[in-house]
């Protein structure tokens, strides 16, 4: 671009107009960087020349030359703005076009009343040179009270506004603005005072900034599933568990509760599909060498739940042989809906004998239990080993929870622990993210529940209150288990119970299975149709459920438990065609898990080798063997390519470590700054084993 250097020095740089500064100001930019516009400088010069009594020819010539320069400019800021004439318009919208003089002009108001005439040149600043107007009213939320600020600053400005800014109208006509601009142009450019041009006093600005900082809403966390407000964890701190409402440790646990969950994505994540590089059949990437990210995160969450602890609680330190109690009931509703008049809570605990984790369900008060007769069925419950039943381990009564103050006895039942398991009620109805119900899922649940019922009935027992949406837990994808088994046998114990009573209760179990599945099936209906008298016709007409599943649900729900007969074995045979789908999915899942275990099989071997190498390189002995080991580690981890760029290749590390662990005869070249060594993996392995053996001795 050709630039006329004579005229460029009088032209304001466009970077000043656009950005407010020019980074090439002291680096050769030929344009003017004076914030006072050249037109205003020329007008100020003319005004000062007119005020003198003698006009010299030189001043006249300079004025003429300045006029010529201004006429040659591409843009003239003093050109009057275009004003359309609306008097000659004849269309019907001509009355809607406003006149230029009627357009309201924004004028910033100052909280301090100023005189009409400007006396001090230090209190004025040209309007065009201001970048920000501090006196512009800022946005004020309606849910905050600024009464104190407005009262404290009422003497400085308008008391009716929250920040002390005058509430006078901001509309001025065009003539007043032109007069004000002329007065500004007559004044020389000066450094503005803190209170000039509507600027806030320092104390006022401090209050506004402090309000803006203190009123910022707390950020929510994307990665936390329950959207709880938590604080950032500190390294080495315990992960607190859930706290019972009203417990002594509630405040302390809330103060130490982490703001963010564990960062499971700290591992190298898989790239998004759009960035995945297509691979050849003989190629692979590092993601295929290790466990998938979703499975790893799923298992990490289970481990986190297992290691969760609770400090500063009012729970007993030991209950029989169990300790380290942590509440895991998410509902925090101690009043039981199944066992009337009882309070029920669930805890995670550690067994002091075998060190395993278990679940303790505490039910109180249970003062009616005065001997061991109600526990006579516990041995049969412990003998049941079924994939769809949570194993019962122990049952006893204790007074450890009340400290012998109230005298109430608590019933404690110990079950196997499945971390992060939720009930069907939370999974499909009342959870944050409910799982939709379909026909395949109903068949899956029906087969698993029938499998559990058959195992219970073979022992001469009944599930009773266990078959409920709140007592059936989901331990894995589409895997359910009956929990809280054996409680009804203890709380509803009868000495004179006959075989006919047991048979009636077993028929009630089958009917409850139908009711549970019906509660899930009606979730497919609209809300206004879920209370219909003929619910089966509504399911056939308004859902995609097959007639076969609806007929099975109707058969289970219409069972006569008083005098009816039901052959559970014959009913299970009718479910055989649907069982093949479940068997197929279970076998596929088993193959997948076995494949993942196979990929992780050699991790322990390589870890032992790396641990051995680290022991050797940090040994204080100086020998030739130490030099060889360090050269090998440099060969593996400190390689550079032809562009002098460090090579970071996981595949290379795994290949070299595996070759070293196997001790093959392949030779490698180990290079140092002064020398090089040719050695085989077999010789290197013998050196490492010998040195490690000597170090141990």
From Swiss-Prot:
Bias kind Low complexity: ranges: 172-187
GO molecular function, one term: zinc ion binding
Chain ranges of zinc fingers (C3H1-type): 7-36
Subcellular location per the Swiss-Prot or TrEMBL entry: Cytoplasm
Tree of life domain: Eukaryota
Bias type Polar residues, positions: 119-153, 212-224
Segments for region (Pseudokinase domain): 308-576
Residue span of motif PABPC-interacting motif-2 (PAM-2): 69-89, 106-126
Region (Knob domain): 616-697
InterPro entries to which the protein is assigned, alphabetical: Kinase-like_dom_sf, PAN3, Pan3_PK, Prot_kinase_dom, Znf_CCCH
Pfam families recorded: Pan3_PK
Residue stretches in coiled coil: 577-615
Location, primary (coarse class): cytoplasm
Biological processes, Gene Ontology terms: mRNA processing; nuclear-transcribed mRNA poly(A) tail shortening
Residues engaged in binding ATP: 361, 416-423, 470-471
Stretch list, region Disordered: 40-67, 106-240
A GO CC term attached to the entry: P-body
Keywords of the record: ATP-binding, Coiled coil, Cytoplasm, Metal-binding, mRNA processing, Nucleotide-binding, Zinc, Zinc-finger
Entry domain remark: The N-terminal zinc finger binds to poly(A) RNA.
Assembly, per entry: Homodimer. Forms a heterotrimer with a catalytic subunit PAN2 to form the poly(A)-nuclease (PAN) deadenylation complex. Interacts (via PAM-2 motif) with poly(A)-binding protein PAB1 (via PABC domain), conferring substrate specificity of the enzyme complex.
Function as written in the Swiss-Prot or TrEMBL entry: Regulatory subunit of the poly(A)-nuclease (PAN) deadenylation complex, one of two cytoplasmic mRNA deadenylases involved in mRNA turnover. PAN specifically shortens poly(A) tails of RNA and the activity is stimulated by poly(A)-binding protein PAB1. PAN deadenylation is followed by rapid degradation of the shortened mRNA tails by the CCR4-NOT complex. Deadenylated mRNAs are then degraded by two alternative mechanisms, namely exosome-mediated 3'-5' exonucleolytic degradation, or deadenylation-dependent mRNA decaping and subsequent 5'-3' exonucleolytic degradation by XRN1.
PANTHER family found in the cross-reference section: DEADENYLATION COMPLEX SUBUNIT PAN3, PAN2-PAN3 DEADENYLATION COMPLEX SUBUNIT PAN3
Assigned protein family: Belongs to the protein kinase superfamily. PAN3 family.
Protein name (record): PAN2-PAN3 deadenylation complex subunit PAN3
Organism ancestry: Eukaryota, Fungi, Dikarya, Ascomycota, Saccharomycotina
